[in-house]
Amino acid sequence: MAKDMDTIVSLAKHRGFVFPGSDIYGGLSNTWDYGPLGVELKNNVKKAWWQKFITQSPFNVGIDAAILMNPKVWEASGHLNNFNDPMIDNKDSKIRYRADKLIEDYMQDVKGDENFIADGLSFEQMKKIIDDEGIVCPVSKTANWTEIRQFNLMFKTFQGVTEDSTNEIFLRPETAQGIFVNYKNVQRSMRKKLPFGIGQIGKSFRNEITPGNFIFRTREFEQMELEFFCKPGEEIEWQNYWKTFASDWLTSLNMSSENMRLRDHDEDELSHYSNATTDIEYKFPFGWGELWGIASRTDFDLRKHAEHSGEDFRYHDPETNEKYIPYCIEPSLGADRVTLAFLCDAYDEEGVEGSKDARTVLHFHPALAPYKAAILPLSKKLSGEAIKIFEQLSSKFSIDFDESQSIGKRYRRQDEIGTPYCVTFDFDSLEDNQVTVRDRDSMEQVRMPISELEAFLTEKTKF
């Protein structure tokens, strides 16, 4: 079925996945709060990433670095001078746009070219396209543009009681630098030999000019990043390894391979630190968007931090007796983006035999579903016994307890939030200690002893 972004956003708000930020005060543009179901979904996504990329990996360990860092970190990394977006203003609407995204949206929506990439174009090239194509402001419908200029994306604040340049610090625009500055600490304390990786999940902040598309692009976002260090010359081999590993992680969580594609960056599109980058993109209802960037960052970051800090980041290879600065492969995934992708991918509207109304269902992998099961007493008279099952299972799983409205409406409600199993406690359950377990996707029902529920859910929800 063709999926509509407005419908998915409406469901997310209605069912408690995502709410507009600061809603009672009119909101704040492109800020979102995760509701009770959204925080469970996102936490499950992060847990699944950590499980496969850190806990079960023979190579990798994790850290949690500070958001606020010494400003010299950003000077060394190049963010103070180079972390900019091309900005253009419409003089009539007074609205500011990212020039590259303005062009890409036009090429996709008007020209039908979903593969056009403006990244890597010079200011002059972008302005020429805007002028030649007659691209207009979506609000004012005029082409009365300023020149394109640089706009630094870092949020600036001050540490201490005085607001002067000596106390100027920044909210981190990426989690990666916290890993690089801790490279020696981790390598020595954990006695790691190459190749090895350091992973992190954490918030980052970018003062994006044109954030949008729900939680796809926001100024405050969460990243799941791995910096994988290897011997120079082996970086492309390891980049290919992590491309496959990342793709397999997505499909193992039921993401449709038909909605995914790998796109290699052209040479003129590569970041200044990269010699090879591949994006895993997902086909959202609004078009293709980057989920995962898998970049070979060479030795750029460690080399720059060595130059600015005076630290020696060379690795002594015990096998060859060489000393060299390791190369780095970075699989960087946006937690909010991939959560949105799983939400879009899971959404479906299905016809139901014997009913004129379609059912809305979220086909989440059970490991990602906010609730693994819902306990449904057939009558409120049975709630006292049914709640005992909830108490038994909720110590191991996220479980819902729902006793209001008809059993059919409760089934539909659980389908709509992606609960894989509904457990109905009826009057026969009082006698035979069995319950009816309904499968979300097939809608098939089986009778099962209450004593077997924990083992059943453990098997069905494992990842």
UniProtKB/Swiss-Prot annotation:
Record carries keyword Nucleotidyltransferase: no
EC number(s) recorded for this UniProt protein: 6.1.1.14
GO cellular component, one term: cytoplasm
Entry keyword set: Aminoacyl-tRNA synthetase, ATP-binding, Cytoplasm, Ligase, Nucleotide-binding, Protein biosynthesis
Pfam families: HGTP_anticodon (PF03129), tRNA-synt_2b (PF00587)
Sequence positions that bind substrate: 98, 174, 221-225, 330-334
Protein name according to UniProt: Glycine--tRNA ligase
Organism: Staphylococcus aureus (strain NCTC 8325 / PS 47)
